[in-house]
């Protein structure tokens, strides 16, 4: 390879790194990083994510009606289904390079503090009611 080819490869590598850093917007966590004081962890995270996803789906004309479920306990089967979806998604992402690099909902929303918008990025796709 010529010098210009090496330069092009290095420049392309740096460009990819900068783009990922700038536009990724995700936090990177270490395994020993403490939880953020305002982060949501464990069952609080699951409950909050479920609430955010229902509101997001209702706002976009989906099948869930957030107003109907506000103020009362959700059915146990619905809660179990949502939690098992989170577990499946976590297991599926364990092998992904992003997960190994310390990214994901626990990193973004427990180890760090994330916004409602960042929470809704982890919601399943909204289904249109028809």
Curated annotation (Swiss-Prot):
Disulphide connectivity of cysteines: 29-107, 41-110, 53-123, 109-114
Single Gene Ontology MF annotation: hormone activity
Residue positions, PTM Serine amide: 129
Record localization: Secreted
A Pfam cross-reference name: Insulin
Residues found modified as 4-hydroxyproline: 34
Region forming the signal peptide: 1-21
Keyword Disulfide bond: yes
Tissue specificity statement from the Swiss-Prot or TrEMBL entry: Expressed by the venom gland.
Keywords: Amidation, Carbohydrate metabolism, Cleavage on pair of basic residues, Disulfide bond, Gamma-carboxyglutamic acid, Glucose metabolism, Hormone, Hydroxylation, Secreted, Signal, Toxin
GO cellular component terms, semicolon-separated: extracellular region
InterPro entries according to UniProt: Insulin-like, Insulin-like_sf, Insulin-rel_pep, Insulin_CS
Propeptide residue span(s): 59-92
Top-level taxon of the source organism: Eukaryota
TM stretches of this protein: none
GO biological process: glucose metabolic process
Modified residues (4-carboxyglutamate): 118
Oligomeric and partner information: Heterodimer of A and B chains; disulfide-linked.
Protein purpose: This venom insulin facilitates prey capture by rapidly inducing hypoglycemic shock. Intraperitoneal injection of this peptide into zebrafish lowers blood glucose with the same potency than human insulin. In vivo, when applied to water, this peptide reduces overall locomotor activity of zebrafish larvae, observed as a significant decrease in the percentage of time spent swimming and movement frequency.
Family recorded in the similarity comment: Belongs to the insulin family.
UniProt protein name: Con-Ins M1
Organism lineage: Eukaryota, Metazoa, Spiralia, Lophotrochozoa, Mollusca
């Amino acid at each position: 390879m010529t010098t210009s080819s090496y330069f092009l490869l290095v420049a392309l590598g740096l460009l990819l790194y900068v783009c990922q850093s700038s536009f990724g917007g995700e936090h990177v966590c270490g395994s020993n990083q403490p939880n953020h004081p305002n982060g949501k962890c464990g069952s609080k995270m699951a409950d909050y994510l479920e609430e955010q996803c229902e509101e997001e789906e209702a706002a976009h004309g989906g099948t869930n009606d957030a107003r109907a479920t506000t103020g009362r306990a959700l059915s146990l089967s619905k809660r179990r289904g949502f939690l098992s979806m989170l577990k499946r998604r976590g297991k599926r992402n364990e092998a992904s390079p992003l997960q190994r690099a310390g990214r994901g909902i626990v990193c973004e929303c427990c180890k760090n503090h994330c916004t409602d918008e960042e929470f809704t990025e982890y919601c399943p796709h909204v289904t249109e009611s028809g």
